[in-house]
Amino acid sequence: KLLMWEICKNKTDSYKEFDRTVDYIYDTINAYKMLDRKSAKFDKEGGIHAHIRRGPLGIILCLGPYNYPLNETFCLLIPAIIMGNTTIFKPAKHGVLLIAPLLKAFKESFPPGVVNILFGRGRKIATPIMKTGYIDVLALIGHSSSAVSLQDEHPNKNRLRLVLGLEAKNPGIILPDADLDHTIKECISGTLSYNGQRCTALKVLYVHESIVNEFNKKFS
């Protein structure tokens, strides 16, 4: 309901986002368990023996988008926490109401200082944080201009690690043997779901010339 009321996402898509987020959390935990089994190992190279062990990267600034404020943000936040990092988590300007029920869960599940949540406009909050130079990883889902701008604010951007999900011209390719009725349905959903306000929305459709007229007729 919080997704529906604040960002006008329909009920079906809101349920899908919640379920997909829960699945992602479990999948991430399972992936970490597999990774942890190999996190410490002895290796030999050039006559030199080494004990190799993975470790946290440090402080991660997580900036999520408004259109998928639960799923996309948690795709950044959950791996960062599970791998032992501390996080500064700033939700998007819109889509923040759903964070309120999660505050208690974060407080009870993690030590103080592991998950730090700030609310407000990104430019006013993220920019001064980046200028401190304390951020080790910038994890952002948004526009490339925002990523470049924030990266430039870091005094040592050459050592700043980036985890980015940016805009793209996502193509749909329709071949001659495609089931047009099903394809049209998927293309409309892919382009117009949530009014097309998705980084994964279809932006360009490439249709084989042998079926383009029939496709356009049905698509329109």
Enumerate the predicted regions with their spans.
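N-terminal Rossmann-like NAD(P)+-binding subdomain of aldehyde/semialdehyde dehydrogenases
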Residues: 1-49
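Conserved small-residue-rich beta-alpha loop and adjacent elements
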Residues: 38-113
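Generic hydrophobic/aromatic pocket-lining and core-packing "Φ" positions
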Residues: 77-78, 126, 184
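A structured beta-alpha segment of the ubiquitous adenosine-cofactor-binding alpha/beta core
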Residues: 49-50, 117-136
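Periplasmic-binding protein-like
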Residues: 78, 136-141
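ALDH superfamily catalytic-core signature
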Residues: 109-110, 137, 145-220
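General beta-strand structural signal in soluble alpha/beta enzymes
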Residues: 89, 117-119, 140-142, 162-166
